[in-house]
Amino acid sequence: MEDYQAAEETAFVVDEVSNIVKEAIESAIGGNAYQHSKVNQWTTNVVEQTLSQLTKLGKPFKYIVTCVIMQKNGAGLHTASSCFWDSSTDGSCTVRWENKTMYCIVSAFGLSI
């Protein structure tokens, strides 16, 4: 049981990271409609708040967070990522959030130190 708790304390827990990302998106964008002039501010706020909250977890990781905000206008968007890492210690999480006017896609990567 102690080994499980120790592993949990140093693991990249996808559900935990996903919740942090969702909270950051809601806080930064919330119920706003897409405004091109605000996108830079929103993306910066999302990644900085996400990084801040991940760091507060106190886990032995280096983090990488990306954020894409795209207006809903019928255009397609395809993204992919590939990582060469130790899947037993490192992890990633991608959250897709949307409202009536935009999509927000955030990826968070945790690399064990």
UniProtKB/Swiss-Prot annotation:
The protein's name: Dynein light chain Tctex-type 1
InterPro entries, sorted: Tctex-1-like (IPR005334), Tctex-1-like_sf (IPR038586)
Function: Acts as one of several non-catalytic accessory components of the cytoplasmic dynein 1 complex that are thought to be involved in linking dynein to cargos and to adapter proteins that regulate dynein function. Cytoplasmic dynein 1 acts as a motor for the intracellular retrograde motility of vesicles and organelles along microtubules. Binds to transport cargos and is involved in apical cargo transport such as rhodopsin-bearing vesicles in polarized epithelia. May also be a accessory component of axonemal dynein.
Keyword set, alphabetical order: Acetylation, Cell cycle, Cell division, Cytoplasm, Cytoplasmic inwards viral transport, Cytoskeleton, Dynein, Golgi apparatus, Host-virus interaction, Microtubular inwards viral transport, Microtubule, Mitosis, Motor protein, Neurogenesis, Phosphoprotein, Transport, Virus entry into host cell
Quaternary structure, from the entry: Homodimer. The cytoplasmic dynein 1 complex consists of two catalytic heavy chains (HCs) and a number of non-catalytic subunits presented by intermediate chains (ICs), light intermediate chains (LICs) and light chains (LCs); the composition seems to vary in respect to the IC, LIC and LC composition. The heavy chain homodimer serves as a scaffold for the probable homodimeric assembly of the respective non-catalytic subunits. The ICs and LICs bind directly to the HC dimer and the LCs assemble on the IC dimer. DYNLT1 and DYNLT3 compete for association with dynein IC (DYNC1I1 or DYNC1I2).
PTM remark: Phosphorylated by BMPR2; the phosphorylation is abolished by BMPR2 mutations in exon 12 which lead to truncated forms of BMPR2 and which are linked to primary pulmonary hypertension (PPH1) [MIM:178600]. The phosphorylation status is proposed to regulate the association with the cytoplasmic dynein complex and may have role in cytoplasmic dynein cargo release.
Organism per entry: Homo sapiens (Human)
Sites of N-acetylmethionine modification: 1
Cellular compartments annotated: Golgi apparatus; Cytoplasm; Cytoplasm, Cytoskeleton, Spindle
An annotated GO BP: microtubule-based movement
Region (Interaction with GNB1): 41-113
Gene Ontology cellular-component terms listed: cytoplasm; cytoplasmic dynein complex; cytoplasmic microtubule; dynein complex; extracellular region; ficolin-1-rich granule lumen; Golgi apparatus; host cell
Tissue: Expressed in heart, placenta, skeletal muscle kidney, pancreas, spleen, prostate, testis, ovary, ileum and colon. Expressed in lung endothelial and smooth muscle cells (at protein level).
Protein family per UniProt: Belongs to the dynein light chain Tctex-type family.
Gene Ontology MF annotations: dynein intermediate chain binding; identical protein binding
